[in-house]
Amino acid sequence: FDRVREILSGNPRFQKIHALKPVTLDVKKGEVLGVIGQNGAGKSTLLKVLARTLLPSTGEIEINGRVAALLELGASFHPEMTGHENVYLSCAIQGLSSQEIDSVYGEIVAFAEIGEFIHRPVKTYSSGMFVRLAFAIATHIDPEILIIDEALSVGDGAFSRKSFDRIMDFKNAGKTILFCSHSMYQVEALCDRVVWLEAGAVKKIGEPVE
């Protein structure tokens, strides 16, 4: 009956949990940093903090350059708006002018490969369609920093390979990339360094082959 007494008394005994403990991390311009760890290790929290979609309770973050982040599935989309409308909204939020959005719109739609669904509300999209459009937007707004959280694990194999090739193009162009994946093959092929998180803390930072 302890749980009942807690509810009735209005004095529940909750334990404070730190999703991410103090982290000191420098990422160089043009570097590709992998983020690995088990589920619940703090990977997504770290990327959200770096993308500034989540404010840290303590500490400081310094980011230089436009950031494009592909985090929670469809988090940046308005569900009632069409894919077309969400492209313009997402790009405008990133600071692109109407003319700049017009110039990349065709490339975004072509890369996403969702056909006539671009004119339908995104609430009707499958998870694969969400990530196709979100990835296409994130990689066509010319960011200096690209943050990707498990995006390539959603959708079909052909689009995953196409997306990975697109990320490699970013790497070859000298863009800074933070890449979270459970695929060590992708991490080893793409990343210059890897940060290994465990229980919200950095366990090790080193090269992917270590």
Give residue spans per PLM region.
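Conserved ABC ATPase "signature" region
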Residues: D2-L8, Y88, E100-F117, A134-A136
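Conserved ABC ATPase "signature" C-loop
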Residues: A199-G200
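Pre-NBD coupling/linker segments of ABC/ABC-like ATPases
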Residues: F1-K21, P208-E210
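Conserved catalytic segment of ABC-fold P-loop ATPases
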Residues: A189-W196
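Conserved H-loop
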Residues: S183-A189
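The feature captures the beta-strand-to-loop junction immediately N-terminal to the Walker
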Residues: I36-Q38
